[in-house]
């Protein structure tokens, strides 16, 4: 390997340097404190584990995004986590096994074999929160509110939210008796708003069902979409009408809490269709082609771990929030330069200063005093009259 290649990083993999790394870490601590104040408990999951665990349930969508390796000890296939949700679901279902609702949160690096979108990171710092054990819209509203509080904490400007419900399409597709292949084709066409394709795929269905499936292409816009949907989907199965009721209840609560938040409804939005079961939501900002925070309901996610539980949650990339956010992060500046000395009194003084939160940098043998400036020190420890004192560096 040529020397010039040794410092190159793979596409989508980046290192974070000072002071940006400090900003990210401070933001991480602030967000975790926010989660804790809402009653969410932190969990730490393995970076790597057996592949079948990572790709169980919600993880099936992650297959193409998961780096895979062979465990040299067992010979089994392992994967680096590409998302926390399957791991947290296992913790709730198999390890904690609580009877009541469980609120869990996480923050850590994930690794993607394929980027989420063009020019996006393959090593985001994912943070999120998940609420297990309650199937009501109240839990969805809580999780969405916590997501918005996270964006407010980092002061991300000009956010707007998209809301949908995969139960609407799923209920109509089930009533139409679509084969798996046709259901997937129609799903793809709806995501692209491909009207002609949707028309062709639903042409042979009973009139009412065909009309309702075709209506999903057009049922997008402001709050008036929900009233329109009640009319155009009025002959839909009960599960579809219940999904509309849930979506309306969530929208009402959000409008009450956040009257200035723009809400956009898209009943053909099926993000995460393979594992989401209810409401889905995402936050966008101008200039970003991808959502900056997203989530939804994924009931029964723990079934593959032996215990099905309703669940809802959200996730976001901390590095993106720090980049987009306007919140002022106050970084520690300055420090005290400690001379290279074996004096026990000096060491005791340094320990006391550090315990008080002061930053003290040890001078190494041969370093001139000018090195203190490079170490961002503005003061120094000097022995005067038999005592070590902190004085300005210029003195």
UniProtKB/Swiss-Prot annotation:
Signal peptide limits: none
Alphabetically ordered keywords of this record: Amino-acid biosynthesis, Cytoplasm, Histidine biosynthesis
Entry GO CC: cytoplasm
Entry's localization field: Cytoplasm
Pathway(s) per entry: Amino-acid biosynthesis; L-histidine biosynthesis; L-histidine from 5-phospho-alpha-D-ribose 1-diphosphate: step 1/9
GO biological-process terms attached to the record: L-histidine biosynthetic process
HAMAP family: HisZ
Biological role: Required for the first step of histidine biosynthesis. May allow the feedback regulation of ATP phosphoribosyltransferase activity by histidine.
Family: Belongs to the class-II aminoacyl-tRNA synthetase family. HisZ subfamily.
Subunit structure and binding partners: Heteromultimer composed of HisG and HisZ subunits.
Name of this protein: ATP phosphoribosyltransferase regulatory subunit
């Amino acid at each position: 390997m040529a020397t010039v290649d040794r410092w190159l990083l793979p596409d989508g993999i980046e290192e974070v340097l000072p002071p940006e790394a400090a900003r990210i870490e401070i933001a991480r601590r602030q967000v975790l404190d926010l989660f804790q104040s809402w009653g969410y408990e932190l969990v730490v999951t393995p970076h790597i584990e057996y592949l079948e665990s990572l790709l169980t349930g919600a993880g099936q969508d992650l297959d193409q995004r998961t780096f895979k390796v062979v465990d040299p000890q067992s010979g089994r296939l392992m994967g680096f986590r590409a998302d926390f949700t399957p791991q947290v679901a296992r913790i709730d279902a198999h390890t904690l096994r609580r009877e009541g609702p469980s609120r869990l949160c996480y923050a850590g690096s994930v690794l993607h074999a394929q980027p989420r979108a063009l020019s996006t990171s393959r090593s985001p710092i994912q943070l999120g929160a998940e609420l297990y054990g309650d199937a009501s819209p109240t839990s969805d509203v809580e999780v969405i509110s916590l997501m918005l509080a996270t964006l407010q904490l980092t002061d991300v400007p000009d956010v707007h939210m998209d809301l949908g419900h995969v139960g609407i399409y799923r209920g109509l597709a089930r009533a139409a008796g679509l084969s798996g292949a046709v259901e997937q084709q129609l799903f793809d066409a709806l995501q692209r708003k491909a009207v002609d394709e949707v028309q062709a795929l639903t042409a042979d269905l009973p009139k009412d069902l065909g009309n309702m499936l075709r209506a999903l292409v057009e049922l997008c816009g402001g709050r008036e979409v929900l009233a329109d949907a009640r009319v155009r989907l009025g002959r839909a199965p009960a599960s579809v009408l219940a999904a509309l009721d849930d979506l309306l209840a969530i929208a009402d609560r959000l409008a009450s809490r956040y009257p200035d938040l723009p809400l956009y409804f898209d009943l053909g939005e099926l993000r995460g269709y393979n594992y989401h079961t209810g409401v889905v939501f995402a936050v966008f900002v101008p200039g970003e082609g991808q959502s900056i925070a997203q989530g939804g309901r994924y009931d029964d996610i723990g079934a593959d771990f032996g215990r099905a539980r309703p669940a809802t949650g959200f996730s976001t990339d901390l590095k993106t929030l720090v980049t987009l956010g306007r919140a002022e992060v106050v970084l520690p500046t300055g420090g005290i330069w400690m001379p290279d000395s074996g004096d026990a009194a000096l060491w005791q003084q340094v320990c006391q200063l550090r315990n008080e939160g002061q930053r003290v940098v040890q001078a190494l043998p041969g370093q001139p005093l000018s090195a203190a400036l490079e170490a961002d020190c503005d003061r120094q420890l000097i022995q005067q009259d038999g005592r070590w004192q902190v004085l300005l560096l210029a003195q």
